[in-house]
Amino acid sequence: NETLYATDYCGNVSGRDVDKFKELGLTPVKGDETGCHYIDECPINMECRVRHKIVLGSHELFIGEVVAAYVRDGVLTPEGRVNMSNLDLFTYVGPDYYSIGRKLGQYGYSVSSRS
């Protein structure tokens, strides 16, 4: 998974020392709202403005407001929902990465079978 590799690399290497876009062969695109660059190869990108910063010991947690979103063609269903089966999603639960996306059920399934 190239996206997983790039995510792990970007989380472990400082942008002060390395041009991560160049090193990983990623395409930077300048966002319309903030001017910050996002990664063209990602299926969904969001531009945010920082609203709060919380110091947590050796790290900081940033709370942002989404001001723009960019979604690649084919990611949304005709109804405008994210088509999870078209994405290879993962999450980080330190220190491990886990796959996301296998459909387990549909909202309301626990009560619909009781009728």
Predicted regions and their residues:
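Basic, polyanion-binding surface patches
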Residues: 1-115
